[in-house]
Amino acid sequence: MSSVVVVGTQWGDEGKGKITDFLSENAEVIARYQGGNNAGHTIKFDGITYKLHLIPSGIFYKDKTCVIGNGMVVDPKALVTELAYLHERNVSTDNLRISNRAHVILPYHLKLDEVEEERKGANKIGTTKKGIGPAYMDKAARIGIRIADLLDRDAFAEKLERNLEEKNRLLEKMYETEGFKLEDILDEYYEYGQQIKKYVCDTSVVLNDALDEGRRVLFEGAQGVMLDIDQGTYPFVTSSNPVAAVSQSVLVSARPKIKHVVGVSKAYTTRVGDGPFPTELKDEIGDQIREVGREYGTTTGRPPRVGWFDSVVVRHARRVSGITDLSLNSIDVLAGIETLKICVRYRYKGEIIEEFPASLKALAECEPVYEEMPGWTEDITGAKSLSELPENARHYLERVSQLTGIPLSIFSVGPDRSQTNVLRSVYRAN
């Protein structure tokens, strides 16, 4: 059986949750491999909209195993809240598995994220203030607290006390703000651990057994390649690696098991937070796309910046993440725009460049070189195949595929699960 990775090709919010939910129907295990509750997934089916941040999108299928992998950072309070959110809607979570090696986000991570962002002032990154960066910093510094520690009260208390000495000194001396007391955190978070205890296990065993048995595993990335700490618009990035290659290194052994990588894009571009954005629209067309596309971040609620489709960005994502299949979302949002534009390359200091620059300064000075295409006015939200799309819409999809170098496998004409159309199976043998 083929196993598949789903990654975002832009700056997140491309609709990965919807596509993962759709592909979950034919998978047997769905695993998230990085990030935390800074990511937001919106899934809509049967007229109901669900919003998740930590739990994999496949949770709505009772017969699928859903995994929160060891590469994630988990806010136990947020996780317990999300579990309650699902239970209130009669969604079973008995199929959830949580890695005992995933790192824990604690109140001091949230506080440090907030005060550091405030300290940066005009140089702020635009963090979601969910404690993600500080938690990954502790992981790299080898002082992090893991889920396994959270379940052992004595081990948790010992590590928490040691960490609070350092964190309080930092908060009080550098940021001139109040620190935390051990008792403010210990009992509450230990109780959260007890509430999730039944889901906790060694998820590498779950995943390797599934792969060895030939079961279909779907690896679900969060954010997007352009927010990858190595390959994205550093430092305006997240603190982990959304790129597909990391899915194996943080979840399973190094044996090659992934057959296909699905790159999810919008038919335009959005970005939440700061940093250079070459194709950004600051006019009425941008406002129209934002409103028609209901563009507000699932996690932050912030209205994103909006721009034309940037093939330079998606080509970069294809190269660094090994993308084999393109899933293009929100095509319906572009209806009614007379002339559409696609960025095909950049102009930098009078020179044409085809590749995405590593230098943030250079990127900020890049001008997009556009190719114009005629738009369409028809309502395409009911289209079930390429042949049902207007000619101009078909040409737009074909051109995006050509410019990115990625064959189009899925296209979406609305937010509902039923508005997703498959041109070729991503679970194919080769």
Swiss-Prot record:
What is this enzyme's EC? Answer: 6.3.4.4
Q: Where in the cell is it found?
A: Cytoplasm
Residues bound to GTP: 12-18, 40-42, 330-332, 412-414
Alphabetical keyword list: Cytoplasm, GTP-binding, Ligase, Magnesium, Metal-binding, Nucleotide-binding, Purine biosynthesis
Q: Where does the chain bind Mg(2+)?
A: D13, G40
Query: Which CDD domains does the UniProt record give?
Result: AdSS (cd03108)
Q: What class of enzyme is it?
A: ligase
| SUPFAM superfamilies named in the record | P-loop containing nucleoside triphosphate hydrolases
Query: Pathway involvement?
Result: Purine metabolism; AMP biosynthesis via de novo pathway; AMP from IMP: step 1/2
How is the cofactor bound here?
Binds 1 Mg(2+) ion per subunit.
Give the Gene Ontology MF terms in alphabetical order: adenylosuccinate synthase activity; GTP binding; magnesium ion binding
Listed as disulfide-bonded, the cysteine pairs are none
Give residues annotated as binding IMP. Answer: D13, E14, G15, K16, N38, A39, G40, H41, T128, R142, Q223, T238, R302
Major subcellular location class: cytoplasm
Keyword NAD, does the record have it?
no
Q: Where is the active site?
A: D13 (proton acceptor), H41 (proton donor)
UniProt catalytic activity: IMP + L-aspartate + GTP = N(6)-(1,2-dicarboxyethyl)-AMP + GDP + phosphate + 2 H(+)
- Report the InterPro entries cross-referenced here: Adenylosuccin_syn_GTP-bd, Adenylosuccin_syn_Lys_AS, Adenylosuccinate_synth_dom1, Adenylosuccinate_synth_dom2, Adenylosuccinate_synth_dom3, Adenylosuccinate_synthetase, P-loop_NTPase
Q: Which GO terms describe its biological process?
A: 'de novo' AMP biosynthetic process; IMP metabolic process
Q: Which cofactor does it need?
A: Mg(2+)
GO cellular component terms, alphabetically, are: cytoplasm
Member of which family?
Answer: Belongs to the adenylosuccinate synthetase family.
| Record text on subunit structure and interactions | Homodimer.
Purpose of the protein = Plays an important role in the de novo pathway of purine nucleotide biosynthesis. Catalyzes the first committed step in the biosynthesis of AMP from IMP.
Its protein name is: Adenylosuccinate synthetase
Originating organism:
Bacillus subtilis (strain 168)
UniProt gene name: purA
